[in-house]
Amino acid sequence: MDIQVSALGAVLALAISIFLIIKKIQPAYALIIGALIGGLIGGANLTDTVTLMMNGAKGMMTAILRILTAGVLAGVLIQSGAATKIAETIISKLGQNRALIALTISTMVLTAVGVFVDVAVITVAPISLEIARKSNITKSAILLAMIGGGKAGNIISPNPNTIAVSENLNVSLTSVMIAGIIPAILGVVITCIISKRLTKKGTYVEAAEVIENNEMTPSFLSAITGPLVSIGLLMLRPIANISIDPLIALPVGGIIGVIAMGKLKKLNEYASFGLSKMTGVAILLIGTGTLAGIISNSALKDVIISGINTLGLPSFALAPISGILMAGATASTTSGAAVASSVFGSTITSLGVSSLATAAMIHAGCTVIDQLPHGSFFHSTGGSINMNMNERLKLIPFEAIVGLTMTIISVSYTHLTLPTTWNV
């Protein structure tokens, strides 16, 4: 396609989208409006601008289909009480003395098995408030522990962001998940270190904020069955060279999980809930696709590459930098991963970086500043433990350190050590 938008148009598309999101316009509409105005200002006529937007949205459709079917597993985990049971078991096994480590690991595990980061934090939040009250730990410490764990789990999970980067760079979902394991482990370590330093900084939990949870939950074995089945099916590719698409593996895990818990009659209810959760993500990705269509056909890539060269950075630095910038612009890991991988992916691989390393570095980069205040994650996580705005804002740099640590490790590990042809 020969339609070209100026770098100014692409930047304005991003800026307008961010401004509208801050003004509480629905993010999908904000992205579409930003893309439209940016394309027109960038020199394309109305017809060409719409064409670019449509083509960008089309590029998201296969990822959207996989994300929608992943709703079966997510719905089962959340609605059946399986996610709560997994978190409670991990925390009880590690004990009160290792409270922050327990919160970090429990949120990481929940996210790693397919629960959204914000939902994982909200799920663990009631338990964290009780622990914080008993251990005299501040809200800042427990929230950072949960968010850091969630960020670590997010880069090794079959979540929408992982699906988006694997699809856009034509590498298997399993490969991207495995490539994130080492960075995720270091992410957990740095989270535990920083959260420990925050135990006496910030506000403490009041007695009235602790809510007892008397909800009946399934056994741990039945709760973990669904995620284990899904991960097992995805792992058949590297183990036995049997490729089972996430489109099949994730819902099958959800179905087997609900059978294991003896709640088959509620499968439709759980699946409907999961679909409702994924629908918002799918719609957001359509809006993201329109923005990606404008940016990918603009001179912005050349400007960023030129800037990297001017700073003397290596060419592969474009991968994590694009992830950081796009996730920060959209305040969303999923949107950032989708835009960065679809817009910059082919350019990065043309510079000699393997598709898998590109996917992993973009993915890790998207965890650095995806928590900015113009996104929903900032507010939903803070609200889960009744944290005030000022205290929540002070956590952003610490969250960024966790994401940046994982990004640096990802660059060191995936680009410098993984074989260029490795794709499992």
Regions flagged by a language model, labelled:
Residues 2-10, 14, 37, 41-42, ...:
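Long, contiguous bundles of hydrophobic transmembrane helices that form the permeation core
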Residues 23-27, 61-63, 74-84, 111-123, ...:
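Short helix-coil transition sites and intra-membrane helix breaks within transmembrane domains
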Residues 29-32, 48-84, 108-109, 247, ...:
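Core transmembrane alpha-helical segments of multi-pass membrane transporters/permeases
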Residues 68-70, 94-127, 286, 311-353, ...:
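Hydrophobic alpha-helical transmembrane segments of multi-pass integral membrane proteins
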Residues 72, 85-87, 118-131, 159-169, ...:
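Re-entrant/interfacial helical elements at transmembrane boundaries that shape
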Residues 97-110, 135-155, 176-179, 185, ...:
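Alpha-helical transmembrane segments of multi-pass membrane proteins
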Residues 129-221, 354, 377-410:
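Membrane-core helix-loop-helix motifs of multi-pass transport proteins
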Residues 414-420:
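Conserved small/polar residues in nucleotide/adenosyl-binding loops
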